[in-house]
Amino acid sequence: MAGHDVQYGKHRTRRSFSRIKEVLDLPNLIEIQTDSFKDFLDHGLKEVFEDVLPISNFTDTMELEFVGYEIREPKYTLEEARIHDASYSAPIFVTFRLINKETGEIKTQEVFFGDFPIMTEMGTFIINGGERIIVSQLVRSPGVYFNDKVDKNGKIGYGSTVIPNRGAWLELETDSKDIAYTRIDRTRKIPFTTLVRALGFSGDDEIFDIFGDSDLVRNTIEKDIHKNPMDSRTDEALKEIYERLRPGEPKTAESSRSLLVARFFDPHRYDLAAVGRYKINKKLNIKTRLLNQTIAEPLVDAETGEILVEAGTLMTRSVIDSIAEQLDNGLNKITYIPNDSAVLTEPVELQKFKVVAPTDPDRVVTIIGNANPSDKVRTVTPADILAEMSYFLNLAEGIGRVDDIDHLGNRRIRAVGELLANQVRLGLSRMERNVRERMSVQDNEVLTPQQIINIRPVTAAIKEFFGSSQLSQFMDQHNPLSELSHKRRLSALGPGGLTRDRAGYEVRDVHYTHYGRMCPIETPEGPNIGLINNLSSYGHLNKYGFIQTPYRKVDREAGVVTNEIVWLTADEEDEFIVAQANSKLNEEGGFAEPIVMGRHQGNNQEFPSDQVDYMDVSPKQVVAVATACIPFLENDDSNRALMGANMQRQAVPLIDPKAPYVGTGMEYQAAHDSGAAVIAQHDGKVTYADADKVEVRREDGSLDVYHIQKFRRSNSGTAYNQRTLVKVGDVVEKGDFIADGPSMENGEMALGQNPIVAYMTWEGYNFEDAVIMSERLVKDDVYTSVHLEEYESETRDTKLGPEEITREIPNVGEDALRNLDEMGIIRIGAEVKEGDILVGKVTPKGEKDLSAEERLLHAIFGDKSREVRDTSLRVPHGADGVVRDVKIFTRANGDELQSGVNMLVRVYIAQKRKIKVGDKMAGRHGNKGVVSRIVPVEDMPYLPDGTPVDIMLNPLGVPSRMNIGQVMELHLGMAARNLGIHIATPVFDGASSDDLWDTVREAGMDSDAKTVLYDGRTGEPFDNRVSVGVMYMIKLHHMVDDKLHARSVGPYSMVTQQPLGGKAQFGGQRFGEMEVWALEAYGASNVLQEILTYKSDDVNGRLKAYEAITKGKPIPKPGVPESFRVLVKELQSLGLDMRVLDEDDNEVELRDLDEGEDDDVIHVDDLEKAREKAAQEAKAAFEAEGKE
């Protein structure tokens, strides 16, 4: 027997064909959400408050300090928040201290700071009753970047940018004359020496001393001449910078100093964040700068006088490591003192070394390091600026390297916590202005923190973020896999990110650093391709927001691959050689072969095994969760694998789902972490279990109660239904399944079913990917799903009186009311069809709505019956089903309703949808198709044992698409069915062809895995043997019921009077320019005329035509289309005297919208009236005939 058995949870064993021993379990798959939010509550929120506060007033006599905060219990439970359309949020109370510096008086007070949305255990937020997800954002990391560009003459120029988290950008660039310039915040450029002089190093000699002698420095100094001898060089430089930043304003050295301090050195205005400081120190650190350079002077320890490194030594990684301690402690540190008129007068510490120029062995180049400012320094420092300039000047000498902005060492993730912290900071900084003003205006004696703090800007910022940010998305809840995928999504779009139109190919492309960090397969098709990605299965964020991936450490000395796990970011990994997870190991755990395949900085090549530093932990660390659920992924073309991964996320939960016979072993983990199942929180024993709740008695005697959700509507309108898995007496451990969620079976993801599939053509019905299906799948509810839709009706106060929910509806027969209760609301369990009343509602009708006759009757009889009009909630088209639930909210019951609303009724209708012609089906390999024919079971081809085939697919769909994985799955699936087992074939480590054929033989199938098939209609065998097997097929959310649409009379657009478009608006079909050409080409003038008039926007014409049709009279001639009138009016509004003339040159009067009664906009109601009027006239005529 090939393979070995693996237990997944307590309910499933699979035969696995994996050969690689897993040394590391998958991390919790939604930790990117939950960990980030937890960190925000524990540290992030406090940091934001400490950043903005304390706040002083303008005279510095009062100060408001932050003391601490407390988050209390949420107002609603999760379930209540869902039902009441409320947010699941907790009140936050912040303690402030107000200090009066004149009197020394201190007032401490706790202030309510609004309700803060709280993340659920599943990693989601409930905002206004809807479940939402904050998608993590992929952005460029703050730091310093160097780039090169080739001009039109083929000359290479260099550039550099310091990008902060917030604040002004500082750029350097060279021009064609080899002069180096700087730009501050995208303004006009100035020679870079001007900025150096402004920092207090004004003499040319000083500049040469710092940077060394090079063409760039020399050319720039020649350009930067002393224009005004009255000013010192520093003052002149400061004025020149001020002129660039504030053109047209009077320039003084003092104002320029304060402006530069505010731009770059004020922590309130300029922030690198922890990650920016880390990246700058890493880039401008002397250890990075010296790597692989030849030192030009001996390095001497200042304290001991010992020569550490001789001149002429190549500074390899090992040499640098040997003197790392001395380098960190300030080896070759030089302190420069700026002059007194500099922007900052503090001494500047740099580390300075001389190396041999790689391009010219006789030249010596000066290298400067920024002497590692502390992690606490969150602004840029003069040392950073000088070290950046040095790196920039060295690029021209061939020292240092330019950055690749698509490298994942330069792109980081802003997860929920950080996005929220930024939003709160925004709100607090708006509040800060407000607080300052109130402190200054009001009387100091009686002020309390409560009086000066206005929390509205903060609550508004949070509300705005959750409600309308591009990154706050309505959760994709088609099935648990789509939930999980959505929580792990990484978007490069959003505020501070890219825009679709500006993103080029490079940023969308797969980069070698994506390996183990971002999935190269799972990304949407269409305009967002490559901008929206998914975290790989083992991907994890470090404290700076860079994605790490785990590797096994290789002990080079012992020649053994250890089980020690090291998590590396992309730029750390660049220094090492990493072997693949499928490298063969011997008994001792060393590499079995002297040469192994490995990766180093984007090169995949063979390396001697004694040079390897790390090894992958698992073959599936490359791909995301949805991709890791595709068996035989290694045999599929990547384009089709992308479709397969994306389509699994669109699978509809079925009534009785089945886990795949051929899985990958990922199904258990995906279901477990998705949040859709009920998982045991503690060990214990089940004491009670039914369909609605499970009780577990813990060992310490306390009781855990788990509530099971039944048929709740998901965000996508599918049924969110959980099924209890345990029974009384079962012992459960923490992490065990208590109940399956939707699309799960026995604790595994089960998106579809395992039908018997044959690759064969049948009467041409599976042309172009169409799917032929047996009627068994319809009758046995194999692909039946339940869909829930929610409809609501509310009563409001109107000017003419309140609306009312009632059974007394005018002009409605008793038959239409048979399912309504005494209040006029539909009963639960009623079967409803299109047009049935769900909630009877009447609205008061003003006098102006009545016709002349009605007004007369009203005056005579005081007839009250006509005072209301029917505004009942009815079943829209295509929404037939069974009433599953009704919820009623009223002010009397204390429900929170919008202002002006007295009562709200929600009706949930469940539809049971069987599979039908037009529905979309798919496999897991991107093999999708539409059901074209449902064939009776007796006509389907059958196997020699009499089993009819369930589905027939077109064999032509396989070769050109190169997704051979489906054929492998087909054969292995048939073997699994015959053997009665489930199989796991993990990605890139699954069943080989030998394993496949061994299993096929073990199952007693023919050696080619094909079979003779018999035609169900004639009983004759088909000419050739056919590949028949079991393939996992899913039904997708694109169902024909949602797309079918037809209109006869419906709503019209206000301006053009043409029918609206789209199913949602009950619109018509667009008859566009090209369609008009087609009718013109056939000379079908009458057809064309009626399409452009009656059927579109000839308002009078369509009414008269309707009347003519109902009365059986000839249809009158059409009039002028409304859009022609709109055109004429538009031209008149431009001041053109536009008139319409007939053939005798007489002016034709076009109707005006505000003339006469005929010109009212015709709505469906008016057509109804016309219908009633015609019926009454017909009745009168009939009675008159009878009398005669």
Curated annotation (Swiss-Prot):
Alphabetized GO MF terms: DNA binding; DNA-directed RNA polymerase activity; ribonucleoside binding
Gene encoding the protein: rpoB
Subunit structure as annotated in this protein's UniProt entry: The RNAP catalytic core consists of 2 alpha, 1 beta, 1 beta' and 1 omega subunit. When a sigma factor is associated with the core the holoenzyme is formed, which can initiate transcription.
PANTHER family linked to this entry: DNA-DIRECTED RNA POLYMERASE I SUBUNIT 2 (PTHR20856)
Gene Ontology cellular-component terms listed: DNA-directed RNA polymerase complex
InterPro entries: DNA-dir_RNA_pol_bsu_external_1 (IPR019462), DNA-dir_RNA_pol_su2 (IPR015712), DNA-dir_RNAP_su2_dom (IPR007120), DNA-dir_RNAP_su2_hyb_sf (IPR037033), RNA_pol_bsu_bac (IPR010243), RNA_pol_bsu_CS (IPR007121), RNA_pol_bsu_protrusion (IPR007644), RNA_pol_Rpb2_2 (IPR007642)
Reaction catalysed by this enzyme: RNA(n) + a ribonucleoside 5'-triphosphate = RNA(n+1) + diphosphate
Family statement: Belongs to the RNA polymerase beta chain family.
Keyword Lipoprotein: no
Nucleotidyltransferase among keywords: yes
Record CDD domains: RNA_pol_B_RPB2
Record keywords, A-Z: DNA-directed RNA polymerase, Nucleotidyltransferase, Transcription, Transferase
Species the sequence originates in: Streptococcus gordonii (strain Challis / ATCC 35105 / BCRC 15272 / CH1 / DL1 / V288)
BP GO terms, sorted: DNA-templated transcription
EC annotation from Swiss-Prot or TrEMBL: 2.7.7.6
Lineage: Bacteria, Bacillati, Bacillota, Bacilli, Lactobacillales
Name assigned to this protein: DNA-directed RNA polymerase subunit beta
Function, as annotated: DNA-dependent RNA polymerase catalyzes the transcription of DNA into RNA using the four ribonucleoside triphosphates as substrates.
